[in-house]
Amino acid sequence: FNIYSNSFKSVNIISNRYNTPSSYLDINNNLIIPSGIDSFISEVVSKQFAVSNEDFNSINYLNDRKNRLTSNNLIIGSSFSFSNKSRKNMYDNEFSEFKLKIELAGNLTNLTSNLLNVSKDEFGKNKVLGLTYSQFLKTETGYIKHWPIGLNSKIAFRTFFGIAIPFGNSNSIPFSKSFFAGGSNDNRAWEVYRLGPGSSEALSEFNEANMKLAMNIEYRFKILGKLDGAVFSDFGNIWNVFDNTED
């Protein structure tokens, strides 16, 4: 919570609405990191500490994200990548490019662990080397097309779709394998990790999800000398689908 300051502020505001135990608070009446805030969240989620339904949903959402971001994950898998580019050389201004990546993780590990009857965690998921391994299918596709318009201008189009589906030993996708939105190479109206998921209000500094759709189109042109300009539109977002997380 020292890093996720927005999440801390949200929980801290909620705690100030109630008769929170003084042992959870510092001299400024703020939740102590990590002991105070962890204890407060634990009691709210387990319903030992009564709050409104709206506050409970907010705390429960932040707790799910905390567990997802801080949990240890063992990822054993393989991937296949394909790329097809029509560009002949660096001076070719009219070209297209298609990329495809498929990643499958945890299947062989799951088969082996079931045969060996390995230990399980508190949720009944198999563990290997003391860690719950991830099992998922992830695909990414991207397409780029450039069209020259005259000598010093062109139109550039890019689209991307990605989805990661957990199954078997997993209910969600590890943070390192999830998608994010925003930033200078994505949806430029938002800072990196600040957009989504879905229509949520971005309670966290690092918002991620397991499905992403992005598209942008640009008109690039020469202004003067080495000074170039561009007019662009960006579309897209991230969403949580087929997992245990709701937007």
What residues fall within each predicted segment?
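C-terminal outer-membrane beta-barrel translocator/porin domains of Gram-negative envelope proteins
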Residues: 2-221, 226, 231-235, 239-242, ...
